[in-house]
Amino acid sequence: MKYYFENDGYCVCCDKNVKFIATNSWYRDNYICSNCKSIPRERALMYLIEKFYPNYNLLDIHESSPCKRGASLKLQNKCPNYIASQYYGESDKIINGYRNENLESQTFKDESFDLVITQDVMEHIFNPQSAFREIARTLKPGGAHIFTVPLINKERTTECWAKLDDNNNIIFLKEEEYHGNPINPKGSPVTFHYGYDIVDLIYKSSGMVTQIFTIDNVDLGIRAEYIDVLISRKI
């Protein structure tokens, strides 16, 4: 079979020499590791975790809304103090092995974690200010929120895409948009189209200082649109 693009390289998610195979021109979701099936943003995130936190396997880590491959699976397998959460609404505290946590109003104690990880989650949060504030609260001093979020608007101002009305119904302010959700077949509504000014939003709401990293390295299978990784540090 002839693919759109393929190359040999090293996958930081499964730690193997592999082929990276793109089945079409939208690399973000379709430039896949032949072994672990990870995609570029997952590899970019794992690369930066290992670069800046080489002792990550010894750290206390919370990941919200993990998937079952790539960086999430590696963290789960290598980190004894890794906790995964999903948000199921008002329900039991543990569901399907996941802790039930609303990122905007968490039940974790203050200063619980060295790292908080989210992958393409923040664009589905209705109140990101509360979520960033809560993430900062649960981080230890010097800890970091390492995350991916599609910076669709780039240099343009962040736009609110959807909100909740007084009855918690979703109101889209722009064209209706959903992304896949592993625990909800309806998908997750897109609530914001972020730009680079997200760093100001994070600082104003949480006091965390944020860097944006853009990696382009086909040898590591890291090439695609909107795969920036953000690291927000609690000073």
Residue spans of the language-model regions?
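Acidic-residue sensor for enzyme active/binding pockets
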Residues: 63, 123, 134
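Alpha-helical membrane segments in multi-pass integral membrane proteins
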Residues: 115-116, 135
